[in-house]
Amino acid sequence: MWTCPWCGRTFAARNQTHTCASLGDLEAHFARSETSVREAYDAALSVVRALGPVEVLAEKSRIAWHVRMSFAAFQPRASWLDGHLVLAREIPSARWRRVEVFSARNVLHAFRLRGRADIDDEFAAWLAEAYDVGCQRHLGR
């Protein structure tokens, strides 16, 4: 693991390209959101925290989750939570708003959550797969 000497963030790759920006306030991301939006976020985070440590990065325009690499990001809206998971494979599902294949083991799956009920067993399994990507287990690390 490499730690940026300027901002203190950790990355799997030495000299990882990133923006050294101070992190924002997590609560500010939800200031204009309905309670159900925060409940969906908290339910998803609870699933991931049960898997192991995760760094929550409240950036200027999004909230990112990071272990060795970022594996999920969220943008709270007034009535829903937009986000994406990075998975090591393409998973067909009507629940995805879009899927972008960057490489064979780097596939972005965009979603929209409206409440805690959206964090069901299926979504929890996808969170676990994304967490493994964040740990780089899909690369044998």
Placement of each model-derived feature along the sequence:
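Charge-dense, helix-prone N-terminal extensions
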Residues: 1-141
